[in-house]
């Protein structure tokens, strides 16, 4: 009986413990009171699991909050920053026009004050900055040019040349360089006075040069030269204008009866085509091997407005390809009038004679310079302005050009000057003045040789091309000189084509004199 009672009591105790545990886990009883009833291992497991779950939940919530904050900041920056930026820049932009508008007015006021001060000075002092140009060919300042120009405009009617040399020492240096055949001792280098010419008066003298006579002679000589041009075959091409796309369509068809340039009795011809005066855009046909009658049949398009066609010229240059040396120029065709055949609304076929290549026709570029002579001061100023379309002398397709000017007398070089070097360009701009002291009695006996050189740091400087001006020059060189002598104290500016130097040397500095760059006479 006692055994059964103990079993019943134990079962009741277990049921009671079970009920108490359910109440504790259900939250009906405080956990501190329940911890003393449960076994140590079970109570420890229940408390540790709860702590781990709470800490894990806190980490997840904090991470999500941080991610949400980053996303919100990024969206805010994308949407709101451009608006704020424009608002910040707007006030600064409103201030800029005021500063810009105020700056030119201050500059103009200072320039006007300087001009007024210069105009109030005597005439010799006003011309002094322009006359004192360095003989080492510096750049002419823009302020000196403007001051001199305005002074000459105001005083041109009543002001005569007032620059008088103090002594004849300047002419003595020139006298030492003259050849012995000239009787220099009998030459009077004194400077005479000239009467002031009033408005409407004209000065006539027996020795005055008349440029009309020289111009007429040069025109006649050029006309005779054109009649004597030697031909070397014919070129066939077609022209048409595309009104819709504003394109000049040029079709090079073929060439006939070309001269043989190779020792085998044939040539390897190809054609280069330009639409002058712009030489930056050019086209070239394929090379046809070993033939004197090549059939090209190639089409090229030049973008040009129809109204500008009357001022354009087509230039065809026919070359012989040489793999191992410089390509030989066979000849050229220049079409001065594009409307010679038709109005180009339809395709028009043209046959033209190919003019044989001469030294003058080789394209080496052009140079622009001005000449001005002051007879009372015995001073000649040559201003090198710029060059264009120079021949590329470096492997990079460019050049480092500078201009060298030599004062010549009967084949001897008396003096030489040069400009600065312009790096890596085929169209350099100089605006540099070069001055020579030449007495009026010796102007007819001298000439100027202008050479455009390519500077080479390692080897010799090479000659790109030369031109010459003087009474013994030909064509434009002589006309430019005569015009300078006819209009004293006035800069005369012209473009001059560069010619290849006969007996071309690698270095122009090694030559004792500048040989004449005249093209060879055609039969």
Curated annotation (Swiss-Prot):
Cofactors (names): Ca(2+)
Topological relation to the membrane, as annotated: Single-pass membrane protein
Mutation effect (residue 322 to A): Loss of function
Organism: Mus musculus (Mouse)
Compartments, record wording: Cytoplasmic vesicle, Secretory vesicle membrane
Origin organism lineage: Eukaryota, Metazoa, Chordata, Craniata, Vertebrata
Protein's name in the database: Synaptotagmin-10
GO biological process: chemical synaptic transmission; positive regulation of calcium ion-dependent exocytosis; presynaptic dense core vesicle exocytosis; regulation of calcium ion-dependent exocytosis; sensory perception of smell
InterPro entries membership: C2_dom, C2_domain_sf, Synaptotagmin
UniProtKB keywords: Calcium, Cytoplasmic vesicle, Disulfide bond, Exocytosis, Membrane, Metal-binding, Phosphoprotein, Repeat, Transmembrane, Transmembrane helix
Residues binding Ca(2+) 3, per UniProt: 322, 325, 328
């Amino acid at each position: 009986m006692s055994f059964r009672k103990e079993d019943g009591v134990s079962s009741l105790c277990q049921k009671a413990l079970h009920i108490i545990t359910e109440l504790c886990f259900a939250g009906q009883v405080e956990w501190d009171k329940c911890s003393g009833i449960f076994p140590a291992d079970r109570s420890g497991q229940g408390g540790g699991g709860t702590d781990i779950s709470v800490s894990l939940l806190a980490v997840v919530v904090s991470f999500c909050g941080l991610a949400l904050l980053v996303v919100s900041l990024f969206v805010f920056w994308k949407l709101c920053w451009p608006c704020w930026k424009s608002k910040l820049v707007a006030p600064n932009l409103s201030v800029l026009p005021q500063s810009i508008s105020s700056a030119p007015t201050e500059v103009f006021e200072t320039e006007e004050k300087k001009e007024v001060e210069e105009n109030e000075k005597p005439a010799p002092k006003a011309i002094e900055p322009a006359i004192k140009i360095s003989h080492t060919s510096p750049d002419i300042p823009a302020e000196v040019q403007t001051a001199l120009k305005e002074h000459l405009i105001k005083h041109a009617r009543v002001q005569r040349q007032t620059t008088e040399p103090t002594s004849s020492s300047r002419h003595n240096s020139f006298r030492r360089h003259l050849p012995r055949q000239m009787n220099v001792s009998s030459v009077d280098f004194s400077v005479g006075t000239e009467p002031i010419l009033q408005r409407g008066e004209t000065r006539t003298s027996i020795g005055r040069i008349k440029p009309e006579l020289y111009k007429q002679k040069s025109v006649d000589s050029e006309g005779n030269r054109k009649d004597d041009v030697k031909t070397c075959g014919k070129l066939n091409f077609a022209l048409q204008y595309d009104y819709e796309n504003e394109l000049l369509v040029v079709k090079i068809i073929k060439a006939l009866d070309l001269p043989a340039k190779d020792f085998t009795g044939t040539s390897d011809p190809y054609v280069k085509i330009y639409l002058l005066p712009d030489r930056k855009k050019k086209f070239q046909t394929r090379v046809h091997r070993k033939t004197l009658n090549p059939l090209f049949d190639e089409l090229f398009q030049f973008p040009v407005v129809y109204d500008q066609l009357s001022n354009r010229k087509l230039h065809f240059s026919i070359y012989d390809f040489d793999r191992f040396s410089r390509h030989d120029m066979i000849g050229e065709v220049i079409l001065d009038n594009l409307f010679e055949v038709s109005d180009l609304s339809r395709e028009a076929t043209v046959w033209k004679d190919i003019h044989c290549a001469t030294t003058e026709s080789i394209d080496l570029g052009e140079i622009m310079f001005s000449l001005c002579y002051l007879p009372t001061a015995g001073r000649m100023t040559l201003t090198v302005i710029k060059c264009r379309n120079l021949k590329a002398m470096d492997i990079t397709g460019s050049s480092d050009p500078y201009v060298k000017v030599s004062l010549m007398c009967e084949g001897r070089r008396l003096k030489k000057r040069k400009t600065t070097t312009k790096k890596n360009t085929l169209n350099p701009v100089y605006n540099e003045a070069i001055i020579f002291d030449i007495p009026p009695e010796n102007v007819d006996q001298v000439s100027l040789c202008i050479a455009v050189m390519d500077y080479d740091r390692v080897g010799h400087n090479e000659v790109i091309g030369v031109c010459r001006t003087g009474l013994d020059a030909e064509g434009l060189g002589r006309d430019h000189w005569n015009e300078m002598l006819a209009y004293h104290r006035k800069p005369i500016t012209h473009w001059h084509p560069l010619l290849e130097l006969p007996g071309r040397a690698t270095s122009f500095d090694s030559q004792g004199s500048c040989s004449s760059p005249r093209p060879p006479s055609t039969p």
